[in-house]
From Swiss-Prot:
Its cofactor is Mg(2+). Catalyzes the transfer of a dimethylallyl group onto the adenine at position 37 in tRNAs that read codons beginning with uridine, leading to the formation of N6-(dimethylallyl)adenosine (i(6)A). This is tRNA dimethylallyltransferase. Pfam families: IPPT. Its EC number is 2.5.1.75.
Length: 329
């Protein structure tokens, strides 16, 4: 077996509803790999149906790390994910296996391979000041305040993106420097590649980057609609109603803002009718998939496989098997 520092990590990325989890579970049953979840909703406890959490039967066949371990009231950042993932990667390598990181939260994948800019810790006083501004004048006023000091970051954020707006303005008020300047200084990118594996300057391990995604976007949209309706039939409304019974939870928490949960929460708040909730949930999921494609198209040396083509899925499985064999043979 290779020295631990030379052992690769395997990335299986892709848009929502592309079949990543099913393929990963299949692979984990026959290959020397362990799965690490890379989905920002699935890190939270209590988000099951709407987050497409694997069933208990599936988890018995293929356990997932970083799954359902965080309380909904606890923030979980990309930096938190990177720190946790690196610990689990080392453990999996020590177990004589390869980590297969599976999910659609590309921000987490980027944080892992590129590292993160050194930013100041959250400051409760500054956050309270920004929250007071939002309460008094609305989040568009926060967006405008950010645009005046950090136009680059403001241009890529919507006035409704409360969490990121708050963080960007907080960073400026704490440091006097725009968030965009920190990111520009921290340009961690691909440094070299060999035998299909990439070496990123922010990570000590070689990386196999793969994506499972349909070429037919209409097919994906159909799958999104079918799955959202299946979630409703499986009890998504009851799941959210149970969450609403917990007084510490509210609609502004990151987990509750996840696609599907947000629309159901707002429906139960009486903001719109059931049919509108269904339509909004499906549209929001399509928009999520579009954003995921946008991120993935920028990923260096990403190997794409068509999730709607059995032979392509088999080829992806074969590539994972080949990398395992090259390490452990």
């Amino acid at each position: 077996m290779m020295p631990e520092a030379s052992l690769p990590i395997l990335l299986l990325m892709g848009p929502t509803c592309s079949g990543k989890t099913a393929l990963a579970i299949e692979a984990a049953q026959t290959l020397p790999i362990e799965i690490i979840n890379v989905d920002s909703a699935l890190v939270y406890k209590g988000l099951n149906i709407g987050a497409a959490r694997p069933t208990e039967e599936e988890l018995a066949l293929a356990p997932h790390r970083l799954l359902g371990f965080r309380d909904l009231t606890e923030p979980y950042s990309a930096a938190d994910f990177r720190a946790d993932a690196l610990k689990h990667i080392e453990q999996i390598h020590n177990n004589g296996k390869l980590p297969l990181l599976v999910g659609g939260t590309v921000l987490y994948f980027k944080a892992l391979v590129e590292g993160l800019a050194p930013l100041p810790e959250a400051d409760p006083v500054v956050r309270a000041e920004i929250a007071a501004l939002a309460d008094a004048q609305g989040w568009p006023a926060v967006h405008q305040a950010l645009a005046e000091v950090d136009p680059v970051t403001a241009a890529r954020l919507k006035p409704t993106d409360k969490q990121r707006l708050q963080r960007a303005l907080e960073v400026f008020r704490l440091t006097g420097r725009p968030l965009a300047a920190f990111h520009a200084e921290h340009d961690k990118t691909l440094t070299k590649s060999r035998d299909g594996l990439s070496q990123f300057s922010g990570l000590p391990y070689p990386v196999l980057s793969t994506a499972l995604a349909p070429q037919d976007r209409a097919w994906l949209h159909e799958q999104i609609a079918l799955r959202f309706r299946a979630m409703l039939n499986s009890g998504l409304q009851e799941e959210v109603e149970a969450l609403r019974q917990q007084p510490q939870l509210n609609a502004d928490l990151p987990g509750i803002r996840a696609v599907g949960y947000r629309q159901m929460w707002e429906y139960l708040d009486g903001m719109y009718g059931y049919d509108s909730m269904v339509e909004r949930g499906i549209i929001a999921t399509r928009q999520l998939a579009k954003r995921q494609f946008t991120w993935l198209r920028k990923w260096p040396e990403l190997q794409w496989f068509d999730s709607n083509d059995r032979s392509q899925r088999d080829a992806l499985f074969g590539l994972l098997a080949k990398n395992c064999k090259s390490v452990f043979s």
